[in-house]
Amino acid sequence: NWTSNQIEKANTAKDVAYLTTVEKECVMYINLCRLYPKDFLKYEVVNYYGTEKYGNYVKYSTYRQSLINLLNFMQPVDALYFDTEAYKNAKCFAIEPGKAGTTGHTRINCKDGNYAECCSYGMDTGKDIVLQLLIDHDVPSLGHRINCLNKAYTKIGVSVQNHVKWDTCAVLDMIW
């Protein structure tokens, strides 16, 4: 299990008063993976096959297996720290498709920015959001995984909002 020291190092957004518990969990779980890839594999990925809501949708996924292979050899990278501007961008874009019922990265009223963006739909916990992005099931580019684990990124903004079709929309914007 995670030590209190590991949780403390990973939980870089814990003192941001306006973030929800789920948003703080997103930052913490990405950081646990970045800081402690082999432990993350052991504690979070090896026995993760999906969610209660969607069943064991990744149990036999080659994408899950490729994440296992990566984490076995990945060197730790620095934690991400909360950034207000990235949060504002993420929040705007979590609300916009949530109301419209859309998915993807096309903005209508939210401004484009110079950041790496990950969008997750339908997940209820920070852990499930992060594992959806890291496993990147059926995303051949593995773009979400690459963004989340890229050592060039140092800052993150996360917003989780309601989505009319998928219940939730989480947007994570990372910058350097």
Question: Language-model segments: what does each one mean?
Answer:
Residues 1-4:
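Acidic, low-complexity proline/glycine-rich segments
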Residues 9-10:
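Low-complexity, glycine/proline/serine-enriched flexible coil segments
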Residues 14-112, 145, 151:
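Short, well-ordered surface patches within globular domains
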Residues 88, 92-176:
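A well-ordered secondary-structure block
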